[in-house]
């Protein structure tokens, strides 16, 4: 029987999130730049002899039932493999905050696909795993691949970029008592900004081309595009903790840029390196505590889910 498998499941931030318009299927057409960071969950998997699939987690607030993306990914992969006798006992060590706009759940689901592909000896390649991931969530294909990627469509169409040249540091903050509904954020975006949406595929593609030509690989600053998140314009006015976080981050010395990630409420600031991010965290910790915000200093990483040695 195959030895147990352990993988890391990185969080992501959005360096760019642009809502282009509405698709024929009712979803929003998006243009994003996603980036993996080294705030990571860990998923441990081992075979079961009776074909059962089970999950436990050290975060009591997280459901480990059939609605969990890890369990859903395991069942999908087993179904597609054609081997109904396959089973797994899985344990998630949770470090990415829940409901934070950091794709923690999606990354955990992607981790299950990668880990069980290895555990069960299925030998599926990354593109096959990404296709399965797309059936479960818009962010999940990116979480399989990771690194720095242009993401189009609902987020499932990936165009990899070389790693950012600068070893940027990140200070990430979140109010642990606040979450934002992603469907609400998109519906509110449509209500507020629908009249400005692009109207057809030709217009979508023209905007994609502009993003492909942008200098994403330059150190954040002079030549790099500014951070953009169209959902931030919707969420920030109605979420005091997001306003507080962004004001706090933007005021820090050496902060290059600050923005909200995904549909929030997590916000982040970029620094020239990890050392600057660590020092900024120490400097502002008292203020963050007063605001009720948790914080993490992180680095960019060039990969998604990864097998641990």
Swiss-Prot record:
Pathway: Isoprenoid biosynthesis; isopentenyl diphosphate biosynthesis via DXP pathway; isopentenyl diphosphate from 1-deoxy-D-xylulose 5-phosphate: step 3/6. Its EC number is 2.7.1.148. ATP binds at residues 97-107. It comes from the Bacteria. GO terms for molecular function: 4-(cytidine 5'-diphospho)-2-C-methyl-D-erythritol kinase activity; ATP binding. InterPro entries: GHMP_kinase_C_dom, GHMP_kinase_C_sf, GHMP_kinase_N_dom, IspE, Ribosomal_Su5_D2-typ_SF, Ribsml_uS5_D2-typ_fold_subgr. One of its GO terms (biological process) is terpenoid biosynthetic process. It holds the Pfam family GHMP_kinases_N. It catalyses: 4-CDP-2-C-methyl-D-erythritol + ATP = 4-CDP-2-C-methyl-D-erythritol 2-phosphate + ADP + H(+). The active site is at residues 12, 139. Keywords: ATP-binding, Isoprene biosynthesis, Kinase, Nucleotide-binding, Transferase. PANTHER family: 4-DIPHOSPHOCYTIDYL-2-C-METHYL-D-ERYTHRITOL KINASE, CHLOROPLASTIC. Belongs to the GHMP kinase family. IspE subfamily. Catalyzes the phosphorylation of the position 2 hydroxy group of 4-diphosphocytidyl-2C-methyl-D-erythritol. This is 4-diphosphocytidyl-2-C-methyl-D-erythritol kinase. It comes from Synechococcus sp. (strain WH7803). The gene is ispE.
